[in-house]
Amino acid sequence: MARVVVYTAPGCHLCAPAVEAVRAVCGDAFVLVDISTDRELERAYRRRIPVVEVDGIERFRYELTADELRDIL
């Protein structure tokens, strides 16, 4: 299975639907990263979250559906 990472932060209104889409495809087999705990991540991702990486490559930004993620995987 591919390594899926979701970058998110508290108060992000687009993050919950993105996490739900990833969970629908991956179950609990993905990494959820709260960027608010790391200054560098905050700087890199704050204006782009949620960001979903698949095997280290940024594949989605802002929105995705479970079907779109399935197509990538």
What is the meaning of each model-derived region?
Residues M1-V25, A29:
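Local sequence-structure signature of Cys/Sec-based thiol-disulfide redox active-site neighborhoods
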Residues Y7, V33, R61:
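Small/polar loops that bind or transfer phosphate-bearing groups
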Residues A21-G27, V52, L69-L73:
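Alpha-helix C-terminal capping segments
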Residues A29-R39:
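Thiol-based oxidoreductase modules, predominantly thioredoxin-like and allied folds used
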Residues R43-R48:
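Thiol/disulfide oxidoreductase modules built on the thioredoxin-like
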Residues P50-E58:
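A short, hydrophobic beta-strand/beta-hairpin element that forms part of a small beta-sheet core
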Residues I57-L73:
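Non-catalytic, surface beta->alpha helical segment in thiol-disulfide oxidoreductase systems
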